[in-house]
Design a protein with these regions (language model features):
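Short helix-initiation/N-cap motifs at beta->coil->alpha
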Residues: 83, 98-110, 153, 189-204, ...
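C-terminal motif of bacterial Sec signal peptides marking the signal peptidase cleavage site
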Residues: 25-29
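A ligand-binding cleft/hinge motif common to bilobed small-molecule-binding domains
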Residues: 123-132, 177-180, 201-235
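Short, low-complexity, disordered segments immediately C-terminal to signal peptides
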Residues: 31-54
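Extracytoplasmic small-molecule ligand-binding "clamshell" domains
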Residues: 46, 50-122
Length: 278
């Protein structure tokens, strides 16, 4: 059982996640976004070859908090795998962009409405989404794991969830996986809009477990918030950079070319290693 000072410490860490989410959301609500990202001009010839309009700044929508892919650090900077990868690709290909911090559902809606040029938000490439969006080459292969309270010694597998409730985040692979097995293993689900509240529900004992993308939950566990992972990774989808179907082909082409270059020169792995320790 977590008590006293340890509980307060965990609560502060979860509160920090929640405040980061709220701060990012308020930026979007005020009509602002994270600072405009301008790539270096070193690869401008590549950008011209890809058919980029001179001086164009692409609007890229993202989630509010989906660590380690996008989140605000202690200095208030918006960082993460997605953010660092996009910055490096833009520098490699010589294009400019501006981040719109909207939340996942709102980011997708903004893209569909033509208010954004693309989405990068740990977005799984699925057949259903491919009917609506064109995706880049996969930039990350994900998967789903189950997390429980750190001092819980009773739950070790899906079989131990029978008769219990499980917390999931709306629109994630974790929620889809939970729905696919809950009839077999006899548990119910409660949905949350963000990871921090989902984690709090497990830590407080309202839910017995949560299902989450493994790099996201793995990063949260590394922050000592009071959770642990008890299952092996279930194979999941790959993440991709998305544009509306038939639109912004030049941006998609630059993303793919830049991604290939980063994988070749080692920068891609360097970015992953910054946030994920295997």
């Amino acid at each position: 059982m977590i008590t006293g000072g340890k509980h307060n410490e965990i609560h502060k860490k979860l509160l920090a996640l929640t405040l980061a989410c709220a701060a990012a959301a308020s930026l979007a609500a005020c009509g602002s976004s994270a600072p405009k990202q301008t790539a270096s001009s070193g690869a401008s010839s590549d950008a011209s070859a890809a058919g980029t309009d001179a001086g164009k700044t692409y609007l890229i929508a993202t989630d509010t908090t989906f660590a380690p892919f996008e989140f605000q650090n202690e200095s208030g900077e918006f960082v993460g795998i997605d953010m660092d990868l996009l910055k490096a690709i833009a520098e490699d290909q010589g294009f400019s962009y501006e981040i719109q911090v909207l939340g996942f559902d709102a980011a997708v809606q903004s893209l569909q409405a033509g208010q954004s040029d693309a989405v990068i938000a740990g977005m799984s490439i699925t057949p259903e989404r491919q009917d609506t969006f064109d995706f880049s080459e996969p930039y990350f292969d994900s998967g789903v794991v189950m997390g429980i309270k750190a001092d819980n010694e009773e739950i070790k597998s899906y079989e131990d969830l029978r008769g219990k409730n499980v917390a999931v985040k709306t629109g994630t692979e974790g929620s889809a996986f939970a729905e696919s097995i809950k009839a077999e293993y006899g548990f119910t689900t409660t949905y949350f809009k963000d990871s921090s509240n989902m984690y709090e529900d497990v830590i407080s004992g309202n839910s017995a477990a949560c299902f989450e993308d493994y790099p996201v939950l793995g990063y949260a566990v590394s922050q000592d918030i009071g959770l642990k992972i008890v299952t092996e990774k279930e194979q999941g989808s790959s993440y991709g950079f998305a544009v509306n179907k038939g639109q912004n082909a030049e941006l998609l082409d630059m993303f793919n070319k830049g991604l290939a270059n980063l994988k070749e020169n080692g920068k891609y792995q360097e970015i992953l290693d910054t946030y994920i320790q295997e």
